Regions:
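Carbohydrate-active catalytic/glycan-binding domains of CAZyme proteins
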Residues: 1-214
Length: 214
């Protein structure tokens, strides 16, 4: 244990951080409350370069604010985007951040995408471009509701990509106890953007990840 990773002097809200390496530098992304209040905005996405795994080397920079229409659906909550997870394109030319937004409950919650060119300044908000629509939404027909809070892993042999996320099997808005972890394979388009498809219900059998020993 090395100590608390402080993102601000006043220890304000900073949640669901993730790290990634780019051009020999270590970066931290997370979501938190803006230093200066923004009407109807609760959480935004931040980035900073790290001096080491427990110390920021730069001041936090806000790179994402919930300003898309689909991110502002929930009529009973302050607008929020969070849980950013880094994902590099197969050729390394793009750095994606996949994030949760739309409210922390179905039917609004979904995954969005922010993208930067690998040669850009990742600490410049202008480097990040948002997808205008969510990239992973609930599947009403098959009964998968409110997908959010994802991460990414490879198959054992490294040839396949998988998204790991949680979702609900019923539509009750506040039923966090109904959330279950899900795993499914995804692909890439020719431009280096992830193609997640639709959430798959838990009862649907899927092929084992390539290289699985059992």
């Amino acid at each position: 244990y090395k100590g608390q990773l402080r993102t601000s002097a006043d220890q304000s809200w900073a949640v669901d951080a993730s790290v990634f390496t780019h051009r020999d530098s270590l970066y931290l992304v997370w979501f938190g409350i803006p230093e200066q209040p923004i009407p109807y905005i609760f959480n935004c996405i931040y980035i900073a370069r790290l001096e080491n795994p427990w110390t920021l080397a730069t001041r936090p920079v806000m790179i994402g604010i919930p300003d898309q229409r689909w991110e502002r659906h929930d009529p009973e909550a302050a607008f929020s985007m969070g849980s950013p997870q880094p994902l590099k394109s197969p050729d390394g030319n793009l750095i994606h951040l996949v994030y949760s937004a739309g409210g922390n409950r179905p039917p609004y919650s979904a995954l969005g995408l922010m993208t930067a060119q690998s040669g850009s300044n990742l600490l410049d908000p202008a480097s990040w471009k948002k997808s205008p629509q969510p990239v992973f939404c609930q599947n009403d027909t098959l009964g998968v509701f409110g997908p959010e809070h994802c991460s990414f892993i490879k198959s054992p042999d490294g040839t396949e990509d998988y998204i790991f996320y949680h979702a609900r099997y019923r539509l009750e808005p506040a039923a966090n106890d109904l959330r279950t972890p899900r795993l499914q394979k995804f692909s890439w388009d020719k431009k280096g953007f992830p193609v997640f498809g639709q959430p798959i219900p838990c009862h649907v059998k899927q092929p084992k990840p390539s290289g699985t020993a059992i």
